[in-house]
């Protein structure tokens, strides 16, 4: 782990202050002598998260950031994401675990079958569906879609107009 982190620091060759908060929170310094190929999926995910935040980027793209993490590590990472969001950073998160997103996101782009199904503010989505959780709000929309077969045709027509 230590070699990977040091190698990335050297490659980036940046004079900026490094954000080692996750490194300490995940207690990865204790594992610096371990080789990446010997790590569990969760520990590998922690290393990836540390590297994503290390150089204090203005934009973060996180693909399934909590996948493979234990509950404590997941909460640590979500707290870090919220801290960075509160600093005004732009953060994109892809996730199939919608329950993980409730405290993290303000907007949602929901894709289905490789197409954007909708793009809304989370508050609007919850208000329109009268649901408090993102996963339930989306399930409500999808359930309504399956009841209304004409919606797919109107969606195609809307796409053609745009």
State where each predicted segment sits:
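Hydrophobic anchor residue at the start of the ABC signature
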Residues: 49
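ABC ATPase "signature
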Residues: 119-120
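Catalytic Walker B motif of ABC-type/P-loop ATPase nucleotide-binding domains
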Residues: 60-64
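Helix N-cap at the start of a conserved alpha-helix in ABC-type nucleotide-binding domains
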Residues: 71-72
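Conserved ABC ATPase signature
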Residues: 35-42
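Conserved ABC ATPase "signature" region
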Residues: 6, 14-31
